A protein has these predicted regions:
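Cysteine/selenocysteine-centered motifs that mediate thiol-based redox chemistry or coordinate metal-sulfur cofactors
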Residues: 161-188
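Chalcogenol-based redox active-site neighborhoods
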Residues: 1-166, 172
């Protein structure tokens, strides 16, 4: 097993690439599925990674706080389930039900979406602002500055980015280093 580094050249202010992925609810989703929203919080995450598990409740809180404001979470699992069986579609469905996910949890089964975004870790967040028929990247990176303990967070990068967009302002910190487990790729 070799871990693929970022192959994408997705930068801030770029148009996000579209996708067509199946969610744990059996529905197929693309960026067009969320055309009515002002922005999207795309989170590459998974079941098995301890970092992703530490952030799971915070991801749920982001959706609870921002979905009503037009900024929902979309979670995408990029790992190959043959390498990490805990990240199989069936286990994703079980996890989504157990944790009461309020957002779509999608499988990047062919592993062709995460490289286009340049995701390298789980979790890795991309905040996309909807500008007509385009979703423009406004933030890339970590959820916050403390994966170990939510009560010790000093910088809430994603919340700060979304709050700035909601206020019509520039995102204060546009990019941070994603902290998490490397994405497990079947071709590397």
């Amino acid at each position: 097993m070799v871990l693929r580094e970022s192959e994408g050249n997705l930068d801030l202010d770029d148009e996000a690439p579209d996708f067509s992925l199946v969610g744990t609810d059996g529905e197929t989703y693309s960026l067009d599925s969320f055309a009515e929203y002002d922005a999207l919080l795309v989170v590459f995450t998974c079941n098995h990674c301890p970092y992703a598990q530490k952030y799971e409740k915070r991801i749920l809180e982001l959706d609870k706080k921002y979905d009503p404001k037009g900024y929902p979470v979309i979670a995408i699992s990029p790992n190959d389930p043959e390498i990490v069986p805990e990240d199989s579609f069936e286990n994703m469905q079980k996890r989504a039900e157990k944790m009461n996910y309020t957002f779509p949890y999608l499988l990047d089964e062919k592993q062709n979406v995460y490289p286009k975004y340049g995701a390298t870790k789980t979790p890795h967040v991309f905040v996309l602002e909807n500008e007509g028929d385009e979703h423009i990247v406004r933030y890339i990176g970590a959820i916050d500055d403390n994966y170990k303990d939510a009560s010790l967070v000093e910088e809430k990068y994603v919340e700060n980015a979304v709050d700035a967009l909601l206020a019509g302002n520039e995102v204060p910190v546009k990019e941070t280093k994603a902290i998490g487990c490397s994405i497990k790729d079947k071709d590397k």
